[in-house]
Amino acid sequence: MSSARQPRIAVRAIVMHESRLLLVNAWKGRTHLWCAPGGGVVAHASLPDNLIREVHEETGLKVTVGVPCLVNEFHDPTGDFHQVDIYFRCQIAHAKLDLDWRDPEGIVTHRRWVSRAEMAQLRVKPDSLAAVAWADADAPGYDPLEPIVA
């Protein structure tokens, strides 16, 4: 039996507004890697309830959680980190990002709405995020093990 840690489970939101996707910085204090908002799940709360909490913490927005649209795994090939992200399509009541909003955990410091063309110029994970967000016909439902990037 391996002594590696168990995979971490996280939830993420695909939030679209006027053909733009909501992204947040993926690493504390750095903005060179972008991802969909979300985070680790806590026990005894449903995946949608975890996602509602995480999106609000990171963006100040309130979402209604829809159907799952992607399961993505990533890991550190040289370590024992392995995370399974479950992405859900979400709806919002309003798209205005409050400039004074602060993530209570201090991880997310930048949030933005991006078009597909703008997203193509950014470093984004997972690699399949654009295809899933814009519902391409060939978008995967499962994106297997990607190496983590820093």
What are these regions (language model features)?
Residues 1-21, 71, 89:
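Conserved N-terminal beta-strand and adjoining loop/helix that marks the start
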Residues 3-7, 33, 78-84, 103-108:
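A generic structural micro-feature
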Residues 8, 16, 36, 63, ...:
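Short connector loops at helix/strand junctions that flank enzyme active sites
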Residues 17-57, 61:
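Conserved Nudix-box catalytic region and its N-terminal flanking loop in Nudix hydrolases
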Residues 18-20, 27, 91-96, 116-118:
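Short loop segments at secondary-structure junctions
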Residues 31-34, 103-150:
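Nudix hydrolase/Nudix homology domain
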Residues 62-70:
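A short coil-to-beta-strand element that immediately follows conserved catalytic motifs
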Residues 74-98, 112, 133-135:
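Active-site-adjacent beta-strand/loop module that shapes the phosphate/pyrophosphate-binding cleft
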